[in-house]
Amino acid sequence: MAKKEVAKIKLQIPAGAANPSPPVGPALGQHGLNIMAFCKEFNAKTMEQKGMITPVVITVYADRSFSFITKTPPASVLLIKAAKLEKGSGEPNRNKVGSVTMAQVEEIAALKMPDLTAKDLEAAKRNILGTARSMGIEVK
């Protein structure tokens, strides 16, 4: 018989750097999970992506056990890394803060493909281009 799901918790945590402090501790603690066990498992699984913001969906079961799925980093984080920026523009329609090449956009779209609802790579590229536009990043 399958375990009974009690809750799903969605968090964005830096890869390889989960610790019991907020937001991880309070989110898991209210469901009675072993916070350190999650932190150790998450850090071991994401060690090769160290520093990247990694979305994670934690499924909590009735017996206080858990499982989790890591997703690809948000497109905005990947674009900021590709453009070598600190953050996006506060006024994207007026101030362009950086630029990325179409090849970089294609690379990001290919990486994000499993988590996007896009049917093909072209649709995924359009999705990434829209994110870049809303952040004030120019595509060349």
Curated annotation (Swiss-Prot):
CDD domains: Ribosomal_L11. Keywords: Methylation, Ribonucleoprotein, Ribosomal protein, RNA-binding, rRNA-binding. Transmembrane segments: none annotated. GO terms for molecular function: large ribosomal subunit rRNA binding; structural constituent of ribosome. GO terms for cellular component: cytosolic large ribosomal subunit. The keyword Protein biosynthesis does not apply. One of its GO terms (biological process) is translation. One or more lysine residues are methylated. NCBIfam families: L11_bact (TIGR01632). Part of the ribosomal stalk of the 50S ribosomal subunit. Interacts with L10 and the large rRNA to form the base of the stalk. L10 forms an elongated spine to which L12 dimers bind in a sequential fashion forming a multimeric L10(L12)X complex. Belongs to the universal ribosomal protein uL11 family. PANTHER family: 60S RIBOSOMAL PROTEIN L12, LARGE RIBOSOMAL SUBUNIT PROTEIN UL11M. Forms part of the ribosomal stalk which helps the ribosome interact with GTP-bound translation factors. This is Large ribosomal subunit protein uL11. It comes from Nitratidesulfovibrio vulgaris (strain ATCC 29579 / DSM 644 / CCUG 34227 / NCIMB 8303 / VKM B-1760 / Hildenborough) (Desulfovibrio vulgaris). The gene is rplK.
